[in-house]
A protein has these predicted regions:
Chain A
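Outer membrane beta-barrel
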Residues: 77-190, 214, 409
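Extracellular/periplasmic loop regions
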Residues: 236, 248-365, 374-375, 415-417
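Transmembrane beta-strands of outer-membrane beta-barrel pores
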Residues: 45-51, 85-89, 98-102, 134-136, ...
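Beta-barrel outer-membrane channel/assembly domains of diderm bacteria
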Residues: 19-128, 390, 399-405, 419-428
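Membrane-embedded beta-strand positions of outer-membrane beta-barrel proteins
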Residues: 41-43, 94, 130, 170, ...
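Solvent-exposed loop/turn segments connecting transmembrane beta-strands
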Residues: 71, 103-109, 160-162, 197-206, ...
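Outer-membrane beta-barrel "beta-signal"
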Residues: 170, 354-358, 419-432
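Repeated loop/turn-to-beta-strand initiation elements of outer-membrane beta-barrel proteins
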Residues: 88-93, 125-128, 177-183, 216-223, ...
C-alpha cells in the first residue's frame, strides 16, 4: 500500500510538470532522421540488504574467518554504454559494462566489453559478424539448456545482458510461401586459445557450432550443435508456438556426450563420472483477461547433482567448518571453495526445478506499474525462493524497481544452505 | 400471403444494403489506408487521465497482407526493441535479452490502450470476414467477424466514409458483443504518392477509463521489401532498412 502511495505520488508530481507543457499531439519528422552513429545506454544504482543465514553451509564457506553480523549491505552501480557506427553494408557495435560494488570486501570496479563486433550485410538474406557477441540460443525464459555458446544466465535476472564470446558467425535467411515460411542457418566459429575465450573450455581448439531455424506450421523450431573439443560434443533442439492469442508454449532438449561431472563425498574425496547427459525444458506463457502474465517452466538439468550428492557437498563444508573451529585449519574449506566455483556454485546446480512468474500489468489503474512475483522450486528437496517485485516505468527513460527475495528449505537442501535467508534491493535505472 | 408481403419488403428495403460487396469494400478500405507494402514512421502517445503523456517513436515496414515489423527509435529506454508479426505469430526482440520471444496479440509492448494487434495491424480483410454492410446516409457500417479464434477482437463495427472509403471509427467487440475499445481515425492528410488517409488514430476503452492512446503517422510511402526482412533472424537489423 505504501508503494502504491509512493508511485501515485511520483505520478502526480511528474504529471504536474508535464501538464505545464501540455500541447496538441505533434510529430516532428526531424525526430525520424537517421544518423550514421548511435550512442546510448543506461546508468543504475542498486543498494542491496542481505539477511544472512549464519547456520547455512555456504555462509560458513564464505564467512568462516570473519563476523559480518546478521545483515550485510552492498552498494552497486552500473554504467552500460553502447555505441554503433554504420556505413554502407558495415556496422560496428560495442556494448561495455562497468560495475562498481561497495561491500564488506571493500570497493570493486570492473569494466567488461559485453559485445563488440563488426557486422557486414551484403544482402537482406546474409549477415556476417566477427567479434565478441552473445548468441542467446534457446526459447526458455529462466533457463536455456541449448545455449551452448553462451554464459549461463541467472534465472533470478534472466533479462540482464551477458558477456559474449569472440566468434565469427553468419546468418543466412530464406523465406517461402506455404507451411515452411522461413529457414535460416547460423554457422559459428569459436576459437579457444590463451587469452581468447579461455573460460569457454579446453584451450587450443577451434570449435564449430550451428543453428538451423525453421518457422514451420506457425512453430519456431531450432536444431543446434556444438563440437570441436573445448567442450564435449552436444546437440539440441527447441520450439515455441502460440496456441491462442494469449497462450504460448515452448521447450528445449539438449544431449551432451560424455559430460564429466566432478563431485565430493562428505569426507571430501573427489570423484569423476562421465556420462551422456540429457537436459530438457518445457514451459508456457499465459495472459489472463485481467492482464496477468504467467510464465511456468519445468527444467530437467541432466548435468545437475542429485539430492544425495548435494547433501554430501554441504556435509563436507560443515565438516571443514567444524575442523576450522576446532583447529584453525581451513584446508578443507579451501578445497570446498575450489570445487564450488563453476560446479556446485553455478545457478540451479541440481536436477529438477520449477519456475513460476506472475506479473500483473497496471493494477489499481496505475499506468506503467507492474508488480510481479517469481518462485523457483527445487522439486527434489522442496526448497524454494520467492521474489516479489514492483516495477514502475512511468517516467520517460527512468525505471524504478523494488525487489525482495526470501528463500526457504531444510538443512542440507539447495536453497536451505544458501548464505542468505532474504534480500531486499532498490534499483533505479536511467536510460540515455 | 404473409410470406409474399415479407418478400416484397425484403426486396424493397433489404437489397440496397446487400447489394454492396462488403468484401470488396473492406479491401478498398485497406488499400486506401496504406499500400500493400510500405514503410512509415509512427509516434505513439499514451495519455493518462491527468494529461500526463508517454511517447514512443517507431519505424514500421509491412509487406503483403500478413507481414509487418516495427522497431522503436525513441525513447532511449525502448530504442532498438523490435516487433514482428507474421499472420497470427508475433515476436518481441529486446536488445539486452538478445533473442526474440513470442508474444500474444492481446498483450501490449508499450502499455496504454493499444495492444500488440493494434500496433502491428494487418489488413482488416486478412483477419475478418464481412458479415453484412449497412449504409446510413453518407456512411457505411461494416459488421466484421474474425476469421479465426486467434484474432485479437472477435467482432468489429467499422464505420467508413461513404465517399472516401476510409474508416472513421471502429468499435472492437468481444464474441458476446462487449465493447473493448473504440478507434477513431482523424485528420485525413495527403502523404504523397497517391496516399490520402487519416494521419491520426485515437483510441479509448471502457476498460481503461480516462486513458487515451494516440498514433500519429508520418512519411508513409510504398516500398518494395524482401520477405527476409520479416524473419526472426532479421529482427535485430530492422533499423538498417531506414
Amino acid at each position: 500500500m505504501v508503494l502504491v502511495f509512493l508511485f501515485s505520488f511520483l505520478s502526480s508530481l511528474f504529471g504536474v510538470l508535464s501538464l505545464a507543457t501540455a500541447e496538441e499531439y505533434t510529430f516532428d519528422v526531424s525526430e525520424t532522421e537517421k544518423k550514421p552513429y548511435h550512442i546510448g545506454g543506461y546508468a543504475e544504482i542498486r543498494p542491496v540488504l542481505f539477511g544472512l543465514d549464519r547456520d547455512a553451509s555456504l555462509y560458513k564457506l564464505k564467512f568462516y574467518n570473519r563476523d559480518e553480523g546478521s545483515t550485510l549491505e552492498e552498494y552497486n552501480a552500473t554504467l552500460q554504454l553502447e555505441g554503433s557506427l554504420e556505413k554502407g553494408i558495415a556496422r560496428l557495435f560495442v556494448r561495455t559494462n562497468t560495475d562498481y560494488k561497495n561491500s564488506y570486501l571493500g570497493e570493486d570496479f570492473e569494466t567488461t566489453v559485453h559485445e563488440g563486433f563488426l557486422s557486414l550485410k551484403p544482402s537482406s538474406s546474409l549477415t556476417m559478424d566477427v567479434g565478441k557477441k552473445t548468441l542467446k540460443w534457446g526459447k526458455g525464459y529462466a533457463w536455456n539448456p541449448v545455449a551452448f555458446v553462451d554464459r549461463p544466465k541467472d534465472p533470478d535476472e534472466p533479462e540482464l545482458s551477458l558477456e559474449g564470446f569472440i566468434v565469427a558467425s553468419a546468418d543466412y535467411i530464406k523465406s517461402f510461401q506455404g507451411p515452411l515460411k522461413t529457414i535460416s542457418f547460423t554457422p559459428v566459429l569459436i576459437p579457444v586459445y590463451n587469452h581468447v575465450n579461455d573460460t569457454f573450455g579446453d584451450i587450443n581448439k577451434l570449435n564449430i557450432a550451428g543453428k538451423i531455424y525453421l518457422l514451420l506450421y506457425d512453430t519456431d523450431i531450432d536444431f543446434i550443435f556444438l563440437t570441436g573439443g573445448s567442450k564435449t560434443t552436444r546437440y539440441g533442439m527447441d520450439f515455441s508456438r502460440n496456441i491462442t492469442t494469449n497462450f504460448e508454449i515452448h521447450g528445449e532438449f539438449a544431449y551432451i556426450y560424455n559430460y564429466k561431472k566432478i563431485f565430493v563425498n562428505s569426507d571430501g574425496s573427489t570423484f569423476v563420472t562421465q556420462y551422456d547427459a540429457k537436459s530438457a525444458l518445457i514451459g508456457m506463457r499465459y495472459l489472463t483477461e485481467k492482464d496477468t502474465t504467467y510464465i511456468l517452466e519445468y527444467y530437467r538439468n541432466g548435468t545437475g547433482f542429485s539430492s544425495t550428492e548435494m547433501r554430501d557437498y554441504f556435509s563436507f563444508i560443515n565438516k571443514g567448518y567444524d575442523t576450522y573451529v576446532a583447529t584453525g585449519n581451513d584446508a578443507l574449506l579451501k578445497k570446498a571453495a575450489n570445487i564450488t566455483a563453476g560446479n556446485y556454485g553455478r545457478p540451479n546446480a541440481m536436477r529438477d526445478y520449477l519456475y513460476l512468474r506472475a506479473s500483473r500489468k497496471e493494477p489499481f489503474d496505475i499506468l506503467y506499474f507492474t508488480p510481479s512475483i517469481t518462485g523457483i522450486l527445487n522439486i527434489s528437496d522442496k526448497s524454494f525462493s520467492l521474489s516479489p517485485e514492483f516495477l514502475y516505468a512511468g517516467i520517460t527513460n527512468l525505471e524504478l524497481r523494488l525487489k525482495a527475495s526470501f528463500i526457504s528449505g531444510e538443512r542440507l537442501s539447495d536453497y536451505g544452505e544458501k548464505q542468505n535467508d532474504s534480500r531486499v534491493e532498490i534499483r533505479a535505472r536511467y536510460y540515455f | 400471403m404473409r410470406h409474399a408481403v415479407a418478400l416484397v419488403f425484403m426486396m424493397l428495403f433489404g437489397i440496397p444494403s446487400y447489394a454492396i460487396d462488403g468484401t470488396a469494400l473492406l479491401k478498398e478500405v485497406d488499400r486506401n489506408l496504406n499500400p500493400e507494402s510500405y514503410e512509415s514512421y509512427r509516434k505513439l502517445i499514451n495519455v493518462e487521465p491527468d494529461g500526463r503523456k508517454k511517447e514512443y517513436t517507431l519505424f514500421t515496414i509491412k509487406k503483403g497482407m500478413d507481414k509487418v515489423s516495427s522497431v522503436f527509435l525513441a525513447p532511449a529506454s525502448e530504442k532498438g526493441r523490435s516487433t514482428l508479426r507474421l499472420g497470427d505469430n508475433m515476436w518481441f526482440y529486446i536488445p539486452n535479452v538478445g533473442k526474440p520471444i513470442r508474444i500474444t496479440s492481446l498483450q501490449s509492448v508499450v502499455g496504454g490502450v493499444f495492444n500488440n494487434a493494434d500496433i502491428l495491424q494487418l489488413d482488416y480483410a486478412a483477419e475478418y470476414n464481412v458479415e453484412r454492410v449497412e449504409q446510413n446516409g453518407n456512411e457505411y457500417l461494416l459488421y466484421l467477424k474474425a476469421k479465426t479464434k486467434t484474432v485479437a477482437y472477435d467482432r468489429l463495427k467499422l464505420y467508413a466514409d461513404g465517399k472516401k472509403h476510409l474508416p472513421v471509427k471502429i468499435e472492437c467487440l468481444t464474441e458476446a458483443n462487449m465493447l473493448i475499445k473504440t478507434i477513431y481515425f482523424k485528420d485525413v492528410k495527403d502523404f504523397g504518392g497517391g496516399i490520402v488517409r487519416p494521419s491520426v488514430i485515437e483510441t479509448d476503452s471502457p476498460l481503461y477509463k480516462g486513458y487515451k492512446s494516440v498514433m500519429i503517422f508520418a512519411k508513409l510511402k510504398a516500398r518494395i521489401l524482401k520477405d527476409e526482412a520479416f524473419t526472426l533472424t532479421y529482427m535485430p537489423n530492422i533499423e538498417s532498412l531506414r
